[in-house]
Amino acid sequence: MALNMNAYVDEFMEALEPFMKVTSSSSTSNSSNPKPLTPNFIPNNDQVLPVSNQTGPIGLNQLTPTQILQIQTELHLRQNQSRRRAGSHLLTAKPTSMKKIDVATKPVKLYRGVRQRQWGKWVAEIRLPKNRTRLWLGTFETAQEAALAYDQAAHKIRGDNARLNFPDIVRQGHYKQILSPSINAKIESICNSSDLPLPQIEKQNKTEEVLSGFSKPEKEPEFGEIYGCGYSGSSPESDITLLDFSSDCVKEDESFLMGLHKYPSLEIDWDAIEKLF
């Protein structure tokens, strides 16, 4: 409330400032020839000095009604303007600051075996070739460190066949050891457990079956196993295997011998042909 009163007083004094100056000559002449003032006395416009000739301060009781009306009108206009400004300030919405979008920001590069936590850290993991389980390699501050940790583990497990994020750096060996000693020991034990992982062996057998068109038998059956009888061993001088016709299986199965005499031999007798000529 006190602040509003001070504001109105300041505006009132600013409005009275043009009328608070009178000329020195007029003030001295008025002081030398004072005029009696009565309650019914109203000065005329001819008796009022012009504003431009006033240079000294005078009392408010010496203002004309026209000047007082002008002062009231000016005060009223200033009050209306101040109220409008206050109302417009309350009605207008405050500008909200938009977030600055950096157009030049580069997108985050994705690395193999690396993922980001919700709080900003980077985690490196690798899948083991034997049982396809994940091995946690550690948490790092940057994505590059996590990618380098994955490369070190992958190069130890898979060798030169590993797909790396930084192949030139890892294969040349110009890098610092990022993996912890416990992770290194675990990777060494995994590498020493088996030379060739089990899934790779199964994959190799399946590849051979696809190329040949049929599955490879575990063991080729022998002649004696097919006909249910044994056979004599081969002589050391030749690789021809001789059948043992004296065995019980041949005697019992007479159809075996009858089949030999049923069909003629298809071999050419060259001696008989030479006798004809």
From Swiss-Prot:
Its main location: nucleus. One of its GO terms (biological process) is ethylene-activated signaling pathway. InterPro entries: AP2/ERF_dom, AP2/ERF_dom_sf, DNA-bd_dom_sf, ERF/AP2-like. It comes from the Eukaryota. Gene3D superfamilies: AP2/ERF domain. This is Ethylene-responsive transcription factor ERF057. Keywords: Activator, DNA-binding, Ethylene signaling pathway, Nucleus, Transcription, Transcription regulation. The keyword DNA-binding applies. The keyword Transcription regulation applies. Belongs to the AP2/ERF transcription factor family. ERF subfamily. One of its GO terms (molecular function) is transcription cis-regulatory region binding. One of its GO terms (cellular component) is nucleus. Residues 110-167 bind DNA. CDD domains: AP2 (cd00018). Probably acts as a transcriptional activator. Binds to the GCC-box pathogenesis-related promoter element. May be involved in the regulation of gene expression by stress factors and by components of stress signal transduction pathways. PANTHER family: ETHYLENE-RESPONSIVE TRANSCRIPTION FACTOR ERF057 (PTHR31657:SF38), ETHYLENE-RESPONSIVE TRANSCRIPTION FACTOR ERF061 (PTHR31657). Pfam families: AP2. It is found in: Nucleus. The lineage of its organism: Eukaryota, Viridiplantae, Streptophyta, Embryophyta, Tracheophyta.
